[in-house]
Amino acid sequence: MFQKFISKHNAPINSTQLAATKTPAVAAPVLSVPNLSRSTILINATTTAVTTHSGLCHVVRIDETNPTNHHALSIAGSLSNVPADMIAFAIRFEVADGVVPTAVPALYDVYPIETFNNGKAISFKDAVTIDSHPRTVGNDVYAGIMLWSNAWTASTISGVLSVNQVNREATVLQPLK
């Protein structure tokens, strides 16, 4: 029996800075234009007040060239001035080929991750295994982080969000004898 183990989050060398006003929604808006395989954004976003279940997300387009269908998605983030009930989770969804998503579609996969929220700040670092090939032929696959809350206040959220598709860096562990 062999296991694949991802030992650390390898953040991209370059990053994008985002300073914008965003309105959380049930169809969570995408924070920035998705890159291929990996992306880190420095976020300084002003959120508008919303009193319903809603969210924001940061995603990347998944590289489908690898013949294996299962890849690790490493995600990490640290944000301040967030709602006390905010949670973060990994998501995966598909859109038609060539379409750049501006919001998460109605159908998406959710993967739980380890999240720490102290009421004013949230941090997380985890890895999940996702299907990297589209389930519907001709679609593009996107995956990333969704930030979700029952109610958002008008505030400025600051921090870092990072998503990395790990498709080449895996260490194979053998069981002890």
From Swiss-Prot:
Q: Which GO terms describe its biological process?
A: symbiont entry into host cell; symbiont-mediated perturbation of host process; virion attachment to host cell
The UniProt entry's sequence similarity note says: Belongs to the microvirus G protein family.
- State what this protein does: Attaches the circulating virion to the bacterial lipopolysaccharides which serve as receptor for the virus. Determines the phage host-range. Probably triggers with protein H the injection of the phage DNA into the host cytoplasm upon conformational changes induced by the interaction with host lipopolysaccharides.
Q: Which InterPro entries match?
A: Capsid/spike_ssDNA_virus, Spike_G, Viral_coat
- SUPFAM superfamilies reported for this sequence: ssDNA viruses
Q: Which domain of life is it from?
A: Viruses
Identify this protein by name: Major spike protein G
Report keywords, A-Z: Capsid protein, Host-virus interaction, Viral attachment to host cell, Viral genome ejection through host cell envelope, Viral penetration into host cytoplasm, Virion, Virus entry into host cell
The keyword Nucleotide-binding appears for this protein: no
- Pfam families, A to Z: Phage_G
Under the subunit heading, UniProt states: The virion is composed of 60 copies each of the F, G, and J proteins, and 12 copies of the H protein. There are 12 spikes which are each composed of 5 G and one H proteins.
Question: Looking at the UniProt record for this protein, which Gene Ontology cellular component terms does it annotate, in alphabetical order?
Answer: viral capsid
Report the subcellular localization. Virion
Q: Which Gene3D superfamilies match?
A: 2.60.120.20
Q: What is its main location?
A: virion
